[in-house]
Amino acid sequence: MNLPKQSGTGMMQSVVSIYPVAVLIWGKYSNREMNIRRFFLLLCNLVGYALGLPAQQTAVNPLIYADVPDMSMVRVDDTYYMSSTTMHMVPGVPIMKSKDLVNWELVSYAYDRLTDDVPAMNLDDGQNTYGRGSWASCIRYHKGMYYVSTFAQTTGKTYFFMTRDIEKGPWKRVEFAPSCHDHTFFFDEDGRNYLIYGNGKLFIAELEADLSGLKTGTERVLLENASAPAGGDIMLGAEGSQLFKVDGRYYLFNITWPRNGMRTVVVHRA
């Protein structure tokens, strides 16, 4: 992957040529629980397609009787692993596994405590960070290592957690500023690593080889308005990035929310 170059107007071009290939709408926007369930099924189907799974599965909704927002998934051999959001609660970023995308078991957490340096995380002096903490994780597997990343507005940082045994640990932790909102990270075939993040306007940057931070000078605007395929009146900009590469093409999935409309999944391809 080559990062887009800056144009003379100060705007950035997209990676190769990136354009919307799908706009998927689900659920009644006032029913958050149903939206989560349907998005979970949609993501399962998309990941299954990308990995060459049979198109049909038998399942009964809801798959999980719990709040499982912002899910990210990866398949390793015959096992699927999924991470989710825990916000202010600890331990954080639950890791679940399944053999069939239907029956899920909680097997681990990426971290025990996010930080001890922020008084609000410890409820000191009547402070709290309710609903904040860590959001929208991303889970990946690369060369024998499991990677889980997340970010926190509470601390202003991005976090990577790494382990060779996702169920038993131990986990190695790397953190850096800034807090890269709703990011997805990607190990490309050329050995370079990337982070895509943002809300509405999406950015891409190359990561240091050891994931210790963003490489200086590599941040570019990937999509000026990733919500555009869903219309012009948007109340929630495109976020929740998840990037996959299938048959030489990159597919970027985002969720957006048109005003007076339904939550919408937008897919761009490069």
Task: Please provide the spans of the model-predicted regions.
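Cationic, low-complexity basic patches in intrinsically disordered or flexible, solvent-exposed regions
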Residues: 6-7, 13-14, 29
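Carbohydrate-active catalytic/glycan-binding domains of CAZyme proteins
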Residues: 55-270
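Bacterial Sec-dependent N-terminal signal peptides
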Residues: 23-57
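Methionine residue identity
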Residues: 1, 11-12
